[in-house]
Amino acid sequence: MKAPLSWLCEYVSVEIPVEELASRLALTGTEVERVAQVGVPGDEANLEYFVVGKVLDRSKHPDADKLSVCIVDVGEESPRTIVCGAPNVRAGITVAVVLPGGIMPDGTVIKDARLRGVASAGMILSEAELGYAAKSPGIVELPDSWLAGDLVADYLPLSECVLEVEVTPNRPDCLSIRGLAREIAAITEVPFEEDISYPHPWGERRVDEDVSVEVWAPDLCPRYAARVIRGITVAESPTWLKARIAQAGMRPVNNAVDVTNYVLWALGQPLHAFDLQQVRGRKVIARRAEPGETLVTLDGETRTLTEDMLVIADAERASVVAGIMGGMDSEITDQTTDVLLEGANFSGPSIMRTSSALGVRSEASTRYEKGLDPELIPLALDMACQLMIELCGGTVSVGTIDVREPETPPRVVTLRPARVDHLLGTTLPVSEMESILARLGCNVRDCGDDFLVSVPSFRRDLEREVDLIEEVGRIHGVGNIPSTLPPQRSGRGGLSPEQRGTRLVEDLLVGAGLSQVITYSFGDEKWSDRLRLEPSDARRKAVRVANPLSGDQAFMRTMLLPGLLETAGKNVATREERIHIFEIGRTFHPSGGVLPDEKRRVGFLVAGAWEGDSWSKAGIVTDFFVAKGLTERLAEGLGVGLNFRPATEHFLHPGKSATVEDPSGRPIGWVGEIHPLVLQEYELRGLTAVAAELDAELLIGLRPETPMFEDLSTFPPVEQDLALVVDRDLPAAEVVAALRVAGGGLLESVQIFDLYEGNQVPPGKKSLALRLSFRSPDRTLSEAEVNDLRSQMLAAVASSVGATLRV
């Protein structure tokens, strides 16, 4: 925001150099990007060359049709002859003259000259030459009351120092001259007048006789106020107003529009002026746009609106995109005589969405989207009416139409001085804290040990005690807070059991040859279809992201597998033939509350060969048993026992997958070969890929807190092989589990080394060849002991799973 220093000085006395002011603003959180000198070079010696002149006579140049020879009184003993090319120069007008020796805004030095044979001792200035406009058709005409020879700088801001300020999003109150002046007053400890007024006369007609106002969308328009000014004359703005508008970075239009822009910059409240004659039905309605409704805005563009956009309409059509830009149909023209003046407060998020959707940003929308003070509207309307009467004439209809939500009482925050010193590391006097808050516009009431602070309506960012403490520290000055070293605290940090378990899982999987990856926690809504999940599968109920970065990241993941498959697909696309990856991350599930449930899971994926061919041996092909072996290796490293049973996951290959359970039978995940149709969806066709995904919290929770030591036996094992005939559909794990139970403590291990299905076993049966290893910790087992235990085990499995010994 551009803030002319002379304009700021109308609200606050700036008694320090502008460079120091810029530095102090920056140190308190309001960055001044640069201090620019605009207009005429501003030293006093140069300004003395710019004087008021009276054109006494004008005659046609003898040798140029477009030039005039003027006799101009500039307050000297004798008038000067000045050649001028402006079409509006004539005898009797008051003008601005630069005398020879004066330096123009562009650096040109004015000299005595001869123009087509006629001597010219100076130059009569236009608004463009003064820096008030980009271009102007003629010279500037000044009020006749100004005296010849007076300095123009005594009447107009010829030279201006402009602060270009970067205002933070939480401080919309500083997007105005008055708001920035209040901040300067607080920083420099000079008086600031909070209570100001702009009195003006009223007419005889009541405003409700001219127009009515309805608000159909109070959620988008909490307050809408209107006044009517009748009988105005639209004309060019006076030079002083053009100068102010131009120095603030805006373009002068006409007196009526320039008044609204002046108020916007002065107070920070956007206003909009309608041509009352163009308001159909003399009715103003703040409503949502109709779907597909169109409006031609002031820039000549036809805007197509949506039903979530707010418009200001009359009885027949939309006239304004609220808070963004007015429409061509109701704009102020040279023929306008009656003006409807709007002062409103609109929903910031709504204005931001509309501005983004339409691709339009304006000074008004910039302020609305940050959240404005609704109590500022009456003051802004008063100021605008006063200026309208002064510059445009007319009368103000009596009263204000003001439609608003119920007024909210001021926010009251308790502030503890002791807490201020504790957080800031200071020992500030209580009186200084009170003074700082009062200078910021707060009402401070001393309640003994605490303050009750009433926050002004223009500071919506002050919600909690810590916000007030920040303000105290900011205005006191961060540089004034003494530096202190943090206290030394002995002792070492440590890891929680969960962190230790996670680190161990990572180490085990890295040790197994896998690389850790981190994938996005977001995905699109089609990932569950690509995984062929059942319509009733709870994992389809993904949490939608409120503000997604893109359409393909609109849902929180409920599984790690999609991210692992996408990573594998990208690696295969770069001709990486062996992918061994794992991830430990969170999945997100609907909870019925504000936030979703989060679960930590560990998953891995192996695609391509598990081990490549070498000169000495053939490679190992990736299959289900690679994934199962990795899962068992992980469990063994954690000291956890796991069981496996057939799985029915549709994204896994049928017959080559398993549900993973803890010793109590509680499911903690799955392992298996990825279905070929799923691999096609992720550009992995032609590859074999296996994966597993486990509940990391449950898995780590099964880990014993204290590892149990088991002494190594010095006695030899006794091994025996046997073949059992069982039902073809019986999981081998059930046979192994039954043998383990029956074998007791002397059975050291059970390994399956062969599976046979053929003519040598009955139909519907299969043969499992198992190697049993027996060992005692305190003696050598005899053959009789082992045979006896083996017989007991055969009887047990025959009873529990229907197994018979194959002979």
Language model features: what each stretch is:
Residues 5, 22-24, 28, 40, ...:
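Glycine/proline-enriched, intrinsically flexible loops and inter-domain linkers
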Residues 1-205, 340, 359, 363, ...:
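Phosphate-backbone binding interfaces of nucleic-acid-interacting proteins
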Residues 116-141, 151-161, 310-408, 552, ...:
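Mobile "lid/hinge" segments at catalytic clefts and subdomain interfaces of large enzymes
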Residues 40, 45-46, 201-203, 263-265, ...:
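Beta-rich nucleic-acid/ligand-interaction surfaces
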Residues 51-82, 243, 247, 260-331:
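Conserved mixed alpha/beta core segments that line enzyme active sites in large multi-domain catalysts
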Residues 2, 439-442, 452, 519, ...:
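A carboxyl-terminal module marker
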Residues 188-216, 392-420, 426-427, 468:
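Terminal amphipathic helices with adjacent charged low-complexity linkers/tails
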Residues 179, 413-579, 773-775, 781, ...:
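Extended, well-folded interaction surfaces typified by the phenylalanyl-tRNA synthetase beta subunit core
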